[in-house]
Structure formats: C-alpha cells, structure tokens
Regions:
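Conserved active-site-adjacent core of cysteine acyl-enzyme catalytic domains
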Residues: 44-96, 102-111, 116, 121
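Active-site nucleophile-adjacent alpha helix/oxyanion-hole segment immediately C-terminal to the catalytic cysteine
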Residues: 1-66
Length: 124
C-alpha cells in the first residue's frame, strides 16, 4: 500500500459495491451520496445511458456542475496526478474507474495509485 492512499468508503451503508462514480463524486464534491445518486439518475435519463457510464458522469461533472476536464500525458498515474495537486481535491479517471484525491491522498476502497490516468477534474 502506498503512503498517498487511504481506504475510504463514502457509501452510507458501508457496503463494498461497484459504485465508484457515486463514491468518488460524493467524496470530491462533498455532496451527499444520495444527492449524487439522484443527479446521476437525471443525467442518465437525459443521455439515455447507464448512470455509471462515462457519458453520464462526464455530463454531470462538465455540463451540470461545470468542472473542466484536463487530459493526462500518456504515462501519468493516479499517484502522479495526486502529487501534482497536493492542496486540491481532484477526481481522477482510469480505465473503468473513477477515484478521488484530496490533498494528495487517494481516498478509495482499493489502491489504484499506480494505474494510468487519462483524465481528471479539479474540484477545489
């Protein structure tokens, strides 16, 4: 386990589920988990997609909440992005997963620090 990773499960019931999108967005934005679920359902209805798919959370983050996407250089890892923003809250996307970095520490249910990142959003 890396020093810049901390286990954190934002789900109110504590279950380990495949809901990284809701967990990460709720953690980063500090919106209630249930509020993020509702926003994702609305986004899914508008985009006619699953609430956890990329187009759905991209729409929520960029079009509804107004966060600007930033694209990674090809060799950047989650740890690299977290280290680049040690005083910020950042949502980081990897293939099939969305995670949150807060003050340089990855908050997630698994250590994805060495995974290659392709896109991120600075939240605060």
């Amino acid at each position: 386990m890396h020093d810049n990773y901390r286990y954190y499960n934002r789900r109110p019931d504590g279950k380990i589920e495949e809901d990284c999108v809701c967990r990460a967005i709720s953690t980063a934005t500090r919106l209630r988990y249930s509020a993020v679920q509702k926003l994702l359902r609305i986004s899914a209805g508008i985009n006619k997609c699953d609430k956890l798919c990329v187009c759905c959370y991209k729409y929520l983050l960029e079009d509804i909440l107004g966060y600007e996407p930033r694209y990674c250089r090809s060799e950047a890892t989650v740890a690299d992005i977290a280290a680049a923003y040690p005083e910020r809250i950042v949502l980081i996307r990897i293939d099939g997963h969305l995670t949150c970095s807060a003050m340089g520490v990855i908050l997630d249910i698994w250590d994805c620090t060495e995974e290659p990142a392709d896109r991120y959003w600075i939240i605060t």
